């Protein structure tokens, strides 16, 4: 190996170790279940994004198997070549019916959806206004676009309006936000954001990755909680990999936006399409979440119970109002130690560190699901409190 490169990489890895930011992989089994096996130890799963428990649902498995048997294991090409299977058309129609939009485009992941859409729509002639806690894929899309990047303080709409007022009138404006923030569990003020985008002549993209399948009518997303709000949002992005228990993502909105992305989005054009098995499972998952209110209600109730108990115990859970509940501890060292103790106690809960979250805000990110019982959550809470007191860290 080239010795110059070896020395450089070894130095960088050593720095990660010293900063408490080194990451490694752990073998995990049964992650689709409430109790998983990690490094051969049974643990309560409080770390996955299988929010509605659909990743292990027999109906999705059967749909995936049926499509594999009928259509094979691969798409064989990109969608613009010969990979645009009839299943794509069917699922995209289902998304439009679900979201109340004109057209949809299925892509391979939430990450590729965001980097592709933002970098295709925006250019050096434009300004993108982005919440400071938006997902990395949004940030990367803005960087790729070459647009002027204005980050407003998290959920601070006065700051956003100030930036909009200061923006050059010659530049097109794009506002982009998560709806449920993935590391904090709080939500965007969508109604106010829409009012600002209309007032200042911008368009808005919302990332519903952690809200699709959970909130709004039929689980269509946070943008569907308020009447007539969703139609005022220009582009909706959502994933199939979280509440829907599958893989992939979608972009949906007015015809003109989706037609443009189909023709200009490099992360869509230059990649092989998703396999038929995934599309079959996604179609079944959409059918289920539109009708199964009980799963959504269980998830929301579990999130409320877990948040309340942790907050009452004295933990800093920020402004979480959803199924994602962080305990913010500050340093990498504290987060890693807490995570290690939790896993030793049988709780799968992972330390989240910079650059995923801001410096000095390392945390344990818990994610409850609809499949957890109150007994599961009480068992976990008791251990979380006990370990925190024992370590003299937080309570």
Curated annotation (Swiss-Prot):
Keyword Hydrolase attached? no
Give the pathway annotation.
Cofactor biosynthesis; biotin biosynthesis
Residues binding substrate, per UniProt? 23, 135, 356
- InterPro entries (UniProt xref): Aminotrans_II_pyridoxalP_BS, Aminotransferase_I/II_large, AON_synthase_class-II, AONS_Archaea/Proteobacteria, PyrdxlP-dep_Trfase, PyrdxlP-dep_Trfase_major, PyrdxlP-dep_Trfase_small
Query: What cofactor requirement does the entry state?
Result: pyridoxal 5'-phosphate
**Residue stretches spanning the membrane:** none
Q: Where does pyridoxal 5'-phosphate bind?
A: 110-111, 182, 207-210, 239-242
Q: What class of enzyme is it?
A: transferase
* Catalytic activity of the protein: 6-carboxyhexanoyl-[ACP] + L-alanine + H(+) = (8S)-8-amino-7-oxononanoate + holo-[ACP] + CO2
- What are the alphabetically sorted keywords of the record? Biotin biosynthesis, Pyridoxal phosphate, Transferase
Q: Name one Pfam family in it.
A: Aminotran_1_2
Quick one: a GO biological-process term for this protein? biotin biosynthetic process
A GO molecular function held by the record: pyridoxal phosphate binding
Sites where N6-(pyridoxal phosphate)lysine occurs are at 242
The record's EC number reads: 2.3.1.47
Q: Which domain of life is it from?
A: Bacteria
Q: SUPFAM superfamilies, per this entry?
A: PLP-dependent transferases
NCBIfam families annotated for this entry?
A: bioF
Cited PANTHER family: 8-AMINO-7-OXONONANOATE SYNTHASE (PTHR13693:SF100), CLASS II AMINOTRANSFERASE/8-AMINO-7-OXONONANOATE SYNTHASE (PTHR13693)
Q: Which family does it belong to?
A: Belongs to the class-II pyridoxal-phosphate-dependent aminotransferase family. BioF subfamily.
Q: How does it assemble?
A: Homodimer.
Described purpose of this protein according to its UniProt entry: Catalyzes the decarboxylative condensation of pimeloyl-[acyl-carrier protein] and L-alanine to produce 8-amino-7-oxononanoate (AON), [acyl-carrier protein], and carbon dioxide.
The protein, known as: Putative 8-amino-7-oxononanoate synthase
**What species is given as this protein's source?**
Bacillus cereus (strain ATCC 14579 / DSM 31 / CCUG 7414 / JCM 2152 / NBRC 15305 / NCIMB 9373 / NCTC 2599 / NRRL B-3711)
| Organism ancestry | Bacteria, Bacillati, Bacillota, Bacilli, Bacillales
